A protein has these predicted regions:
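N-terminal leader segment of winged-helix/HTH proteins
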Residues: 1-32
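Pre-recognition alpha-helix immediately N-terminal to the DNA-recognition helix
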Residues: 13, 40-43, 102
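Short, locally clustered residues in the helix-turn-helix/winged-helix DNA-binding domain
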Residues: 15, 43-47, 108
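Alpha-helical linker/hinge and terminal dimerization helices associated
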Residues: 17, 21-24, 60, 103-121, ...
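The N-cap/first-turn positions of alpha helices
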Residues: 18, 36-38, 100
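N-terminal helix-turn-helix DNA-binding core of bacterial DNA-binding proteins
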Residues: 23-63
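Residues within helix-turn-helix
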Residues: 53-54, 65, 72, 92
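Charged, amphipathic alpha-helical coiled-coil/dimerization segments
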Residues: 72-130
Length: 140
């Protein structure tokens, strides 16, 4: 086996699939005025309602300097609020706003719309997701 062949790499099909799936999200997310990264942040916010910045960084597998501009745009759109915890300038609490909660209704169609674009059996999708989640756990 030649380990330097592209077809032998695990990372390449993961990279291509990730890129292509995010591309397919784009027209659906444009309808609700979100980028993919903003969308996944909002999914966390819809679930948590309130979360510390450092916990969001860990949950999203992103660096704080990558996440900060995304949060700024969500704040500018009035979807979230950032509050500093008294006595600790580095500890920030993120809260979803009423407008952010209302956006969830519009966003409910996005997963179904995307599902129609992907030619994968439901069972295969579940299996793939389970495998990827196990792989993600090794990164912590």
């Amino acid at each position: 086996m030649d380990y330097l062949k592209l077809d032998e790499q695990l990372c390449f099909p993961l990279y291509v699939c990730s890129k292509e799936i995010i591309k397919r999200y784009k027209p659906f997310l444009e309808q609700i005025d979100l980028t993919y990264t903003q969308y996944i942040v909002m999914m966390v916010m819809w679930e948590e309602k309130e979360i510390q910045f450092r916990d969001l960084v860990n949950k999203m597998y992103l660096e704080s300097n990558t996440l900060s501009p995304v949060l700024k745009k969500l704040e500018d759109k009035k979807l979230i609020e950032r509050k500093k915890i008294t006595g600790n300038d580095k500890n920030i609490i993120l809260s979803i706003t009423k407008k952010g909660i209302e956006l969830k209704e519009e966003a409910k169609l996005v997963p179904m719309q995307l599902g129609k674009c992907l030619e994968i059996k439901e069972e295969d999708g579940k299996t793939l997701k389970e495998i990827l989640h196990r792989l993600m756990q090794t990164f912590n």
